[in-house]
Structures are given as C-alpha cells and as structure tokens.
Amino acid sequence: MKEPRIFPRERPTPWTRAPLPPRGRLDGGPVMNAGHPMGVNSDPFLMAAGSLGGNLAPFPRNAAPFQNPSGSLASNPAHFAAGARDPGMTSFPRGMNPTGTGAVSFPRPGGLLGPGPGPGLNPRTGALPGPGPMSNPRLGGLPGPGPMANPRAGGLLGASPDPRSGGPMVPGCGPNMRAGVLSSGTGPPNPRPVGLGPGPSPNLRSSFLGTNPAPRSGMFPGPGLGPNPRACGLGPGLGPNPRAGGLGPGPNLDNRAGGLLGTGSGLNLRMAGPQGLDLAPILRAAGLLGTNSVSFSQASGNMGTNPPTMTRVPGPIGPNTGPSSRGLGLPGPNPSPMSRAPGPMGPNSAHFSRPGGPMGVNAGVFPRGTGSGGLNPNAFSQSSGTLASNPGTFQRSAGLQGSNQAVFPRASGPLGPNPANFPRATGLQGPSPAAFPRSAGPLGPGQVAFPRSAAGHLGSSPAGPVGINPAPFARPTGTLGLNPASFPRMNGPVGKTLVPFPRVGSLPGSNPAAFPRPGGPMAAMYPNGMLPP
C-alpha cells in the first residue's frame, strides 16, 4: 500500500523507494534507508534517500548546521544521481550536515550509475553494494571504473576508509572524479587522500582534518586541510575554503564545482547540477572564477572574511594568484600582499602596480587597493584616478622614513620643481625613487614616511602632528594629478610636525588652504606648501 506522502513533494526519484526525509528534516535530513535499493545503510546514521539513490552516506542527524534549502536542492531530491549531480561530490543532501559523517560516503546512486562500487560501506553506487566494476563511478558511469570501490562510508570521522581514497587511508587510485563531470573521470587520480593530507589533486577531500578522508564533514573538528574547506557561516574557515556548514570550517576542501569552474583545479566546486551551490556559503561563482586554481576560501556573506588564502578574483582577473584572503565585504585591512584589483588586471599578482593616471605604472611595491579600497595595511591603497598610480616606489616605512634616501620626486607641474629632491614627475616619471627624504628646510634630513591620508577631494590631511601615521590612507582620486594625498609630515626625527598638507589637485602650487602652514621652522615653507629646498 502506498505509504502516505510525508511531503507534498514528489519523490526524489521515482525508481527509488527511499522515503522522503521526515518532515522536520526538510533538507537532507537523515532518513531511514527504507528499503532503499542501496539497502546497505552501512553507516549508523540514517541515510537520506534522494536522487543520490539513497545517499548511503550516513549523515548525522543534525542536519541543522547547514542551511536547509528547500526546493529541488532540498534533500538531494534532484534526480541526478549523486555522481551525475555532482560527481565526486559526495553530496550531502543539501541540508545535511556533512560533518556528521566525516567520511560520509554517499553511495552514488546505483541503478543508473551502475553497480555500487564496493561492497564496502555505502557503496556509492547502486543498489548492489557488492563491489561494482566501476568503483564508485562518481560521475555516474562516465568515469571509467574507478580502481577503488571507494565506498565512502567510513564512520564519522575515523579514517573513514572512504575507500574512495583507496583503502581507508590510502589515496584512492581511482580517478575519483570528484570534480564533477568536467573533471573527466580520467583526470588525475585525485585520490582522496584520507588522512594523508592534501592529495595530489587539489581536491583533497581530506580537509585539514587529515584523517578524515573525505572530511566532507563540515563541522568536523580540525581545520580542514583541504584547500577548500568550506566554512559556512563560521568565522574564517581555516581551510582555504572550509566548507563547514555552520560548524566551523568544514574540512571539505572540495570546491566541488563541477564543470563550471572547469576542473577547478580539481577543486570540485560543489556547484554541479541543480544542486547548485551545495552549501550556500560557497558562492562558487562558476565560470566567473574561471579556474580558481588557488584554493580560495569562499567566504560567503556571513563568513566574513575568510582569512585563509582564498584568492577570489572576480571576473576577468582570472586566477588571483596572490594568496590573500579576500573576504566578501570589506575585509578590513587586507594584510595579504594580494592587491585586490578587480577588473581585467589578469592574474592579480600580489604587488601589482596599478598603472593609473599619468603617473604611469606605480612601481611601488605596495599594491594599490582599488578605490579607497579597504586599505591594504601595508600598501596604501591608491585610489585610481589620475594619481592612481603613485609612481613612487618609495616604501612607506611606518615610522621614521629611516634611511629611505631615494629622493622622492615630489613636485612636478605647478608645484614647481621642488628642487632636486624628489622630482616627482607625473606621467613619464614612472616610478620615482623610493623614499623621499624630506631633507630640506628646517625639517632637516629626517625622511618621514608620509602616510597618504586622503579625505574628500584632497582629503583633509590630518592637521597636527601625525606622528608616524603609517596607516595607509587611501589616496583620493580626482584631479590631484600629483600625489594628491596629503603627506602628513610626521613629527619624529623631524621634530617639526609638519601638519600634513595634502597636495592639492589642480594647481597644487596654489592651493594655499590645502596646506596648513605650521608656524615655527615650518613657517619657512614655500607658499605652495613645499618645504624649502
């Protein structure tokens, strides 16, 4: 007799009799493996039935940690077999908390996929748990026979054999195409090294957890070693992309985005199929990321910045090489060298001079953040604009400029040639020598780093002793062709605190108001605010 429908929803797959998840467990909740063809509920955990064909992978009951999306994603209802749906992604039912079972092996839906890989726990595949010729065809048949049955079951954590990784610990030889269809089954074995630490392929299932072979379990303890543990809402995921649902960095480092990313370096963004982002937190922008070769921690929304080295380069940038963690939203000072330059920059290398404005390329090593650009603490983010690239390579030493002797070409144009000292020419000048010592005038040789402080057009340079204001100030954009940012002259060895006078845009020379004229030795400043030669 027909069992009453728990949900109004259609069964995930007509051919499976797996019961829908209990009402409370909207998404991926563990359900008893009721007569599921997979039958073997190898894991003590209930298995969520679903298109996975009875996700054998035992999931812990607490599905809660993950968002339980409803809809097709919910409870893995998608018909596509796990393999198909997100090949190699041991997908937890969407809501499922992967953590429950560290090695959760989701049997790839059998039937379609073909013989379940291993007699082993949770044959990934089909009904017959017996070792199928195809070991765990993640891809659903497509992938050639994975040498390893690699049923991913394994207890919670343990070294869940996750045979997928071949033997409990041994990396599976099989293609283990975790990487979705894109990643052809043939791809590198991409053994899912169990505890082995990152496997050859980026897509180590084993997150930091180490042993957790396919520590897909988001919450499992231990930062996921994997390049991409996805941490859902938890603070910064340790792993580059901890996929931890709510639980803290999930070891999963799979990017799991099949195809979209391309192979995604083997990171399977879990994006494949309707499943879409398996864990909401992962915004795998398929395609957009291009191949995100670097493991990037995907900080999604709540994630805040995921400090780990996720280089998420949006759009054209292509793989952001710099390993800087780019959290969504303003990460605040982005310590990483990575310049956060969006746009066609191409690979965003850590120090990229942003050639903007007449200055020409900014030779300066410090990356200019775009816009006021959460200032890279080290680098002053240079707003783009004419001034955008501060040619000077001058390193901004926080504190005394120290011996940055290079004269910093400072003036060009209306300012009049600030005598020899820093001929700062815009345009052609190209990178001006680094530090410009403020040697002239009362200041004496003290070369102070001028933090660029910008507010408003000129930015009001902070008056009064700035002291050493190493903090990078975003350089205002605008007409200030020259280095408009005011350099606060710090007191310090200089002794005289020049109140920083911003370079005025337009005629820097004549912007009298722009520079507060300090009295005392500073009084000698030229009208244009420049120090005397």
Swiss-Prot record:
Gene Ontology CC terms, in alphabetical order: nucleoplasm
Location of Omega-N-methylarginine modifications: 396
Keyword Nucleus: yes
Disordered: annotated segments: 1-31, 67-164, 177-259, 299-350
Primary localisation category: nucleus
Biased composition (Polar residues): 299-309
Record PTM Asymmetric dimethylarginine, positions in chain: 368
Modified residues (Phosphoserine): 160, 432
Domain of life: Eukaryota
Basic and acidic residues compositional bias, start-end: 1-12
Location in or out of the cell: Nucleus
Alphabetized UniProt keyword annotations: Methylation, Nucleus, Phosphoprotein
Keyword Nucleus: yes
Family listed: Belongs to the DERPC family.
Function: Potential tumor suppressor.
Protein name: Decreased expression in renal and prostate cancer protein
Species in which this protein is naturally found: Mus musculus (Mouse)
Organism classification: Eukaryota, Metazoa, Chordata, Craniata, Vertebrata
